[in-house]
Amino acid sequence: MIMAAGSTGERPFFEIITSIRYWIIHAVTLPAIFIAGFLFVYTGLAYDAFGTPRPDSYFQASESKAPVVTQRYDAKSQLDLRTK
């Protein structure tokens, strides 16, 4: 087989995306990846996997807004009081 100069020997992109084999494979895999990603986030597994707090756990139930630290050098004790 003689290849053109500069050719890598790979199939042209247009030939790949117009093949039936490409669409049979991707008609299953692309929706499956989308559904898996949606379930990963929707079930909360993403929060557990990456260790981030869930949206409902940023504030305590009794609080209606974010806590404000008023003393720069006393911040740790202020936050400790908040969590008790």
Curated annotation (Swiss-Prot):
Q: Which GO terms describe its molecular function?
A: electron transfer activity; heme binding; iron ion binding
Q: Which UniProt keywords apply?
A: Electron transport, Heme, Iron, Membrane, Metal-binding, Photosynthesis, Photosystem II, Thylakoid, Transmembrane, Transmembrane helix, Transport
| Highest rank taxon of the organism | Bacteria
Q: Tell me where the transmembrane regions lie.
A: 24-38
Q: Which cofactor does it need?
A: heme b
Indicate yes or no for the key word NAD: no
User: Where is this protein localized, as stated in its record?
Assistant: Cellular thylakoid membrane
Q: How does it assemble?
A: Heterodimer of an alpha subunit and a beta subunit. PSII is composed of 1 copy each of membrane proteins PsbA, PsbB, PsbC, PsbD, PsbE, PsbF, PsbH, PsbI, PsbJ, PsbK, PsbL, PsbM, PsbT, PsbX, PsbY, Psb30/Ycf12, peripheral proteins PsbO, CyanoQ (PsbQ), PsbU, PsbV and a large number of cofactors. It forms dimeric complexes.
**Family note:** Belongs to the PsbE/PsbF family.
How is this protein named in the record? Cytochrome b559 subunit alpha
- Organism whose genome encodes this protein: Prochlorococcus marinus subsp. pastoris (strain CCMP1986 / NIES-2087 / MED4)
This protein's gene is called: psbE
